[in-house]
């Protein structure tokens, strides 16, 4: 307990770090196949310089989505444009992009700024230009203005990205989400830190620091709480922490393994792995009462539970077939069905939010990679070519996966699109990073 009192840094809960990216995203593959789009620098209508370049945030978001490729602004016409009223369709006749984002920023009181932006359908504008004069409003896909503070520039940039992404793809954007992960730095006495950051690595916050291992963070469906495993008391225990009130509750401290917590879709329960009755089995714990209900009962190891979106079944890893494979258990009937058969091992699975695909770690020829299986066709696609991949977590819109891997001998985070085309690494400056978890929509 003396070690805990000295090193467990609960006092630094949600202590915001400097405004820089803790995880520097390095894109490694997929930009050339992305859809071209134009994002113009937002017109500044004030003295000096704006607090931040919102267009840079939007461009970075769209690149990281793996879906879009912003064009170099130096090759674009009307570089001073700030609104639809200034748009000249004929000037854009030969620009090979499907849309253009334009906007403006102007002071609007003390530490207040009015941000306006328009999303223009460039393909429609080019087609209409061939037919003769027409109203520019016919090209307008979205137009908004909002008053924000200087501290909100980056967040509002993510909001614009969400709008643009959804308008052009029909899929909700996930740029205003967060990720949690564990940083391990053995040069420090409290080597383990549970961190939270924006999806792109900015606005990093420390939730907990400990000299003992921290692992398996999992978000609640409302994004208010985080469940995780801590060894701070020299044994595995599961905690749930409210990110706003800082209230921290010990949910499971049974003898043996207490691991792999994951919130139910209604946020009232945790699916966990416990070994209190012998072999590791799957249980569901009521968070309010802490009552644990046993779900599986087999002499082999059952672990890594995750919920189906309807909350009626669990996906889990089991060795009951001789090697680790993924199984589904119906919570009402208790019926267990094997889900994976390809490759040597399949483990660490989760179902995408739309319920159509399964994301998991596949081992084939001794290599561990992230894979996706279509649940209707049962077709499996290996998404990554990195080494020793683990702990995949799916974005709430189902388009991207963040996972742990090894690069140059260090544990780092990486991301891949669920179609496998876009890939990126997210290295951290100090230490190693593992156990990522993507938040729900916030």
Swiss-Prot record:
The keyword Cell cycle applies. Residues 1-21 form the signal peptide. GO terms for biological process: cell division; protein import. Pfam families: PD40 (PF07676), TolB_N (PF04052). One of its GO terms (cellular component) is periplasmic space. Part of the Tol-Pal system, which plays a role in outer membrane invagination during cell division and is important for maintaining outer membrane integrity. Belongs to the TolB family. This is Tol-Pal system protein TolB.
């Amino acid at each position: 307990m003396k070690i805990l009192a000295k090193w467990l840094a609960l006092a630094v809960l949600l202590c915001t770090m400097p405004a820089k990216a803790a995880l520097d995203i390095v894109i490694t593959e997929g930009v050339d196949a992305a859809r071209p789009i134009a994002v113009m620098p937002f017109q500044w209508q004030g003295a000096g310089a704006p607090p931040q370049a919102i267009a840079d945030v939007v461009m970075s978001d769209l690149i990281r989505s793996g879906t879009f490729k912003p064009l170099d602004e130096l090759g674009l016409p009307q570089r001073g444009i700030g609104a639809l009223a200034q748009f000249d369709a004929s000037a854009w006749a030969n620009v090979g992009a499907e849309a253009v984002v334009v906007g403006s920023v102007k002071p609007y009181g003390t530490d207040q700024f009015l941000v306006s932006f328009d999303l223009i359908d460039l393909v429609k504008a080019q087609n209409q230009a061939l037919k003769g004069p027409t109203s520019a409003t016919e090209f307008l896909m979205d137009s908004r203005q909002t008053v924000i503070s200087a501290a909100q520039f980056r967040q509002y940039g993510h909001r614009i990205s969400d709008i643009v992404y959804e308008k052009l793809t029909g899929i909700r954007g996930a740029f205003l989400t967060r990720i949690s992960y564990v940083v391990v730095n053995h040069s420090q006495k409290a080597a383990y830190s549970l961190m939270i950051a924006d999806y792109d690595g900015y606005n990093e916050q420390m939730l907990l620091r400990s000299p003992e291992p921290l692992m398996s963070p999992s978000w609640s469906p409302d994004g208010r709480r985080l469940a995780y495993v801590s060894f701070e008391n020299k044994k595995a225990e599961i905690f749930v922490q409210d990110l706003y009130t800082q209230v921290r509750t010990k949910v499971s401290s049974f003898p043996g393994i207490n691991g792999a917590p994951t919130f139910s879709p209604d946020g009232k329960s945790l699916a966990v792995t416990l070994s209190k009755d012998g072999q590791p089995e799957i249980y569901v714990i009521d968070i309010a009462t802490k009552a644990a209900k046993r779900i599986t009962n087999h002499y082999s190891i059952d672990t890594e539970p995750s919920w189906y979106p309807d909350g009626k079944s669990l996906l889990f890893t089991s060795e009951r077939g001789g090697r680790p494979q993924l199984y589904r258990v119906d919570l009402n009937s208790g019926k267990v069905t094997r889900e994976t058969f390809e490759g040597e091992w399949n483990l660490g699975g989760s179902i995408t939010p739309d319920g159509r695909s399964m994301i998991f770690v596949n081992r084939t020829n001794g290599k561990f990679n992230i894979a996706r299986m279509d649940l209707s066709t049962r077709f499996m696609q290996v998404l990554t070519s990195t080494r020793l991949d683990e702990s995949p977590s799916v974005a709430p819109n189902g388009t991207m996966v963040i996972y742990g891997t090894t690069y140059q001998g260090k544990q780092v985070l990486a991301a891949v699109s669920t179609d496998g085309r876009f890939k990126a690494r997210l290295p951290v400056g100090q230490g190693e990073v593992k156990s990522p978890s993507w938040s729900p929509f916030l």
